């Protein structure tokens, strides 16, 4: 409670470092409709067999359902319209990741506990960038999980997700280049809503906050006890 109440995907992942005890952590999104054991063993395997790997991302085909029709391609809209262009522009070393925003990934605790976590949907791209900067491209891997199907979100939700991801990339550029771009930009988003034939604006604050590395939290040291390697 003393660290404040926040919500978001990254917040949940950051807190999972505190409540878990293993040397390897694997995260899998909960909205997968074709869940299969390969989503687990496919991610754990490379980390067990390749000691040089610090972090592994899943990739796959991403079908999209439109009405009653499922198209073999077309999923991963935020990746293709926001994340991939940003990575090619500012972090080209990461441009070869097939699914940089994949919700199926894992890493070694002694690496993850050293990293800040974006509280919202910027967490995936933020972790990729930080591990690249701290450990180099050879520490990162990706594994083929064949195909992933999930509940597709409406376009307005994807727009808000992109807003968070863009903020995270700006923050990482600020940290890398000693800039202060993020503190000067607008952190509210005007969303275009419709009701019958009427259009109106709805303003929503979407500030992608960041948690410090878990290793900086005193209670984490206490909880990990003998399992914690200082």
Can you annotate each of these PLM segments?
Residues 153-230:
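Terminal low-complexity segments of carbohydrate-biosynthetic enzymes
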Residues 1-21:
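Active-site-proximal specificity loops/subdomain of glycosyltransferases
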Residues 25:
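Short aromatic/hydrophobic "clamp" motif used to bind/position activated sugar donors
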Residues 1, 30-33, 53, 58-61, ...:
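Short, ordered loop/turn segments at secondary-structure junctions
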Residues 20, 74-168:
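Conserved catalytic loops of nucleotide-sugar-dependent glycosyltransferases that act on lipid-linked
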